[in-house]
UniProtKB/Swiss-Prot annotation:
Predominant location: nucleus
UniProt organism field: Euscelis plebejus
Designated gene of the protein: Kr
GO BP annotations, alphabetical order: segmentation
The UniProt record lists the keyword RNA-binding: no
Molecular-function annotations in GO: DNA binding; DNA-binding transcription factor activity, RNA polymerase II-specific; zinc ion binding
Protein name (Swiss-Prot/TrEMBL): Protein krueppel
Record key words, sorted: Developmental protein, DNA-binding, Gap protein, Metal-binding, Nucleus, Repeat, Zinc, Zinc-finger
Length: 74
């Protein structure tokens, strides 16, 4: 519902950016605190968001899940 109304009741106390969901604010706050709870088991990299860790892991696995629509190259 908030998506359609534009309501963003959750505000960052540091930079005043606003969010529709409380968990989006919690994730955002890690940018200010420097907390990076997701770490790569293959190297020393740490990440704020788990999605960024998953994308990074492809460096180690060689996975290339997206194919080019024009030439099918990955």
């Amino acid at each position: 519902e908030r998506t359609h109304t534009g309501e963003k009741p959750f505000e960052c106390s540091q930079c005043h950016k606003r969010f529709t969901r409380d968990h989006h604010l919690k994730t955002h706050m890690r940018l200010h605190t420097g907390e990076k709870p997701y770490h790569c088991t293959h190297c020393d990299r740490h990440f704020v968001q788990v999605a960024n860790l998953r994308r990074h892991l492809r460096v180690h696995t060689g996975e290339r899940p997206y194919a080019c629509e024009l030439c099918a190259s990955r």
